[in-house]
Amino acid sequence: MKGIGTDIIEIERIELAVSRSGQQFLDRVFTAAEQEHCQGKVHSLAGRFAAKEAVLKALGTGLREMRWTNIEILPNHLGKPEVTLSGPALERAEKEGIHRILVSIAHDRGRAVAFAVAVGKEKEG
């Protein structure tokens, strides 16, 4: 394990950001594929936002030179969220020897919570 991160957010905060800034907020934080997957469902957007924050913490950095869209979180064929990094986020992961990042997302009582674990390559032998 190379790092861990967690985040919790009130779903209402994301709802407010969407109502205030609309598409500008969505485009700044979420990839086109994430937006298509969430279909405007605020709880899904909030879960992904929390997951991106958790991933940043697992990487051991804040946004700094990264963009929110350098971290993409989409479900695999079984519905499990999977992280895809690009640009500076991918460079940071490679520099730290991070092979993949596992995430878990949950929603309850008006909040979304996410947990991320950065995993290094398994040792052979």
Swiss-Prot record:
InterPro entries given in the database record: 4-PPantetheinyl_Trfase_dom, 4-PPantetheinyl_Trfase_dom_sf, ACPS, Ppantetheine-prot_Trfase_dom
Main location: cytoplasm
One Gene Ontology cellular component: cytoplasm
Cofactor(s) required for function per UniProt: Mg(2+)
The protein's enzyme class: transferase
Residues involved in Mg(2+) binding: D7, E53
Catalysed conversion reaction: apo-[ACP] + CoA = holo-[ACP] + adenosine 3',5'-bisphosphate + H(+)
EC number: 2.7.8.7
Function per UniProt: Transfers the 4'-phosphopantetheine moiety from coenzyme A to a Ser of acyl-carrier-protein.
Name of this protein: Holo-[acyl-carrier-protein] synthase
UniProt source species: Desulforamulus reducens (strain ATCC BAA-1160 / DSM 100696 / MI-1) (Desulfotomaculum reducens)
